[in-house]
Every structure is written in C-alpha cells, then in structure tokens.
Amino acid sequence: MPQSVLKATSEDLKKMKSAYAHHLTDTLPPGALFQAKVPGCTITAYRSGKVLFQGQKAEAEASQFSHLKATDPKSSKTPAVTKYSPPSGIASMSVIGSDEVGTGDYFGPITVCAAYVDASHLALMKELGVKDSKGLKDPQIINIAKDLIKTIPFSLLVLRNEKYNAMQEKGMSQGKMKALLHNQVITSALEKLDGKQPEAILIDQFAEPGIYFKHLAGKKIIRERTYFSTKAEGIHLSVAAASIIARYAFLIEMDKLSEAAGFEIPKGAGPHVDKAAAKLIKLHGEEALRQFTKLHFANTQKAKKWL
C-alpha cells in the first residue's frame, strides 16, 4: 500500500487535527493522537510527531503539508552520504539550483525555477538579500525577484491548475509532475549558459534520487554532477534564488486568480481555504474549481460542506 510519512511539531499536529475535523475516526490505534479518513487515504498522527498517510492518494494528501519534513518510516537515523549528496565546498561553487512553490497550496499553480549563480556572483546575491525564502515576506520576495530576473540566468515553468488537474486525473502523481518540471527547467537553464558548464546542479529534494530518475524514464536528463538535498536553500544561493523567483511567479498567479474570482484567494490548505473555495463555488459555480484549485486535495470535499 502506498504511504508517506511526515514529522510534525505539536503545533503542526493541532493544525492538522483541525484541518481533518470532519473526517476524524472514533477509534484510535495505540499511540495515536488522532486518525482521519478521506477518500483514498487514511491519516494517522502519533504522539511522537510522526504522521502516516496510507492509501492510493497518500502522496497527494501528504503534499498538502509540504512544509513538514518527510521521513523514512523505517529509520530515524541520519541519512547516508551517497553519490547524490552535495559535495563539501559546494556553497562556493558555480551552481544551477532548482526549487518549486505551490505544491501544498490548494489554490494556485505549481511554479518551478532553476537558476544559475556563478561563483563570482555569490557576494552580489547576498547584497541583493538572497537567502532562504521562508524567512522573507511577500513584499521582500517581490523586490528581490525583480532584481534577480535581470541579473542571473534562470528558467521558470508555471503549471496552472487546469493542466495540473488534467494530468492528475490521468493518473500522474504530483511527485512525477515535479520531477518533469524540475528536469525541464534545469535543461532550459543549461541551454542559457551558452556552453558553460556549472560545477554542480543542486535540486531541493522532494523524492529519493532513484525515484526522481525513475519518473524521468525516456526523457533527456543530466545525471553528472547532479545532487539532491532537503533544505537546499541553505546549502547554495542558487536554490535560494530559484525559490524566490518561483515564489514571485506564484504570487503573480495568485493575484490573477484573485482578480478573476472577485475576492482575495488565500494561500495554504487549511480551513480558511475551505471557506474561500465554498465562496468561489457560490459565485462562479463548482466547475470554476478546475481553473483555481488542485481538485484532488481534500479541501474540495470540505468546501462543499460549507454550502
């Protein structure tokens, strides 16, 4: 049975329990804090902080909480160093970094960016304010991104909701979509370097390398000097720059959706999003969800309970 495991803080667990308030079960497994069942997935949260998603839609359901750290359910040991682990000294190298935004948001697209930062531009990146985007507010993201897109080579793709939903309904997992998008922006960014080769390619890890490359079977891929790491924004500024540009693009798309909806479209996937989706249905009909949301998220059914 497909499954995903996340590690959550006590505060995260409270928010998750609230998000699944309408789907909680009456009986609990030993050690469980709560259990919820939604179509295609059973979610079990343990007092240890482990949250287990099981079922055909486990990956999709877990992706709503992409800010949480994925973990191997069989081991809590430090991950082994592999050939795909970033080399020591990568922080001072010339690198193409890639990252994505929007995978855990019910509304809005997925935006993926690959950005090249030459070693000679690392100091400039710091001057521009480039750092882990999680520590930046939206106005800062916008200002920094406007400088970045005029300064460094990058490639950006936006997977809007209608196409996302069509791909998902044909059986493609979000993980495969992300792999295809990352590969495409990396390839495109390389082409913009006019033959110059980066010292490394660093991908903000969302899947094990073997799974990532399996998703890309039959595609043109670059394996040489390609590395994966979680929290890669803190490892090289190219990933931080890519994340900032991707988030900037996401904000632009969300503004467009808000204008089309006639009210502000919220980020995230919590209860406030359910209410906004219900409002969208009332104003524009249920079919409007296809252009605004990731339909397979549990929020779709939760929104209907507000009607």
Swiss-Prot record:
Segments forming domain RNase H type-2: 93-307
Record has Metal-binding as a keyword: yes
Record-stated family: Belongs to the RNase HII family. RnhC subfamily.
The organism of origin for this protein: Bacillus pumilus (strain SAFR-032)
Cofactor needs: Mn(2+); Mg(2+)
Gene3D superfamilies listed in its UniProt record: Ribonuclease H-like superfamily/Ribonuclease H, TATA-Binding Protein
GO molecular function, one term: magnesium ion binding
The protein's name: Ribonuclease HIII
Keywords assigned by UniProt, alphabetized: Cytoplasm, Endonuclease, Hydrolase, Magnesium, Metal-binding, Nuclease
Swiss-Prot/TrEMBL GO biological process terms: DNA replication, removal of RNA primer; mismatch repair
Co-factor remark: Manganese or magnesium. Binds 1 divalent metal ion per monomer in the absence of substrate. May bind a second metal ion after substrate binding.
SUPFAM superfamilies: Ribonuclease H-like
One CC-aspect GO term: ribonuclease H2 complex
Pfam families: DUF3378, RNase_HII
InterPro entries listed in its UniProt record: RNase_HII/HIII, RNase_HII/HIII_dom, RNase_HIII, RNase_HIII_N, RNaseH-like_sf, RNaseH_sf, TBP_dom_sf
Uppermost EC category: hydrolase
